[in-house]
Amino acid sequence: MTFLTRTLSALLIVVSAHVFAQTNLVTNLPKTEYGYPDFQGYWENLHQTPLQRPEELGDRQAYSEEEAFALIEQASASLQKRSLPLDPDREPPQEGRVTNQADDDFDDFPIDIAMINGEYRTSLIIDPPNGRIPHDIVNRAQTNEFYFYLEDNNLRFDGPEAAYGGERCLFPGPQLSMMYQRGLSPYTQIVQTKDYLMILGEYPYHARIIRIESDHPAIGFAKWMGDSVGHWENQTLVIHTEKIRREQSFPPIFSTVNTQITERLSLGENGTLVYEYTVTDPELYLQSFTAQIPFTRMHNGQVIYEYACHEGNYSFVGSLAGARWEDAQSEIDNDAN
């Protein structure tokens, strides 16, 4: 190991231990002009902790300090290897293999382990105790009910309304932008007033507006990201979301229009934000499940940028035109018979 590698690894371990070690809730909180905890600003959740716990870890909610540091150093070494110049005469990668090298993957490469309440978490999910999503195996075929309905009835290209949310680059997942890190961007901006909280994710780039101390409409309809209302419980903002459009059912967290999501936002020590959510849907899950994610403030001067994705928008006109051509050919063939 070179001096640079040793130095970088040691620095990463120290920074990781410091940044993620203190997420206990505190009483001396920054407040807005209205007297509520101030969540405003730019946040990031750069860590390698997976949403679901590896099955071999069972009910182990946390790594030991030694295990966590070993994982951080391993990720640091991979990050350094990824940054090295590539051999122009190298063989092509094995079919289906993702190497995380610059020529085939530009996702973020986080190295930290998420830490909450002094624990290096093995997964974001903390309940059930095994850290896994409790899918109802009997109903797995219904987890993408919208997609399968279109496929089974040959409606996939009837019109733009029949397109999958991710296909049109509208919502590539998750249902709510802070629920788990989605490859390209773990960055979020929060803007807050007395009556509203706005959460803007960089990827996908959508503004979610939450009404505070309000109610869901008596007769509502499904919307992108659902309908969200919040209320204060001491220093915690509790947000309830319902009526999420069925086009937003993506793995690993599937949803229906009846899915309920309850989020809890609280400020922790050292300027951290503790984000917790619980997903409930008896149609899909054997029980509710809960995840916790620590966010830290982005460095001064860092902001988020619009992520523009057009593959499923401009190109979709061609997809529909091709489908209409196939329809016409089918009619010609039927007339010929």
Where are these regions (language model features)?
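PEST-like low-complexity, intrinsically disordered acidic/proline/serine-rich tracts
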Residues: 22-337
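Short, linear, compositionally biased motifs with a strong N-terminal bias
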Residues: 10-14
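Bacterial N-terminal signal peptides that target proteins for export
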Residues: 1-8
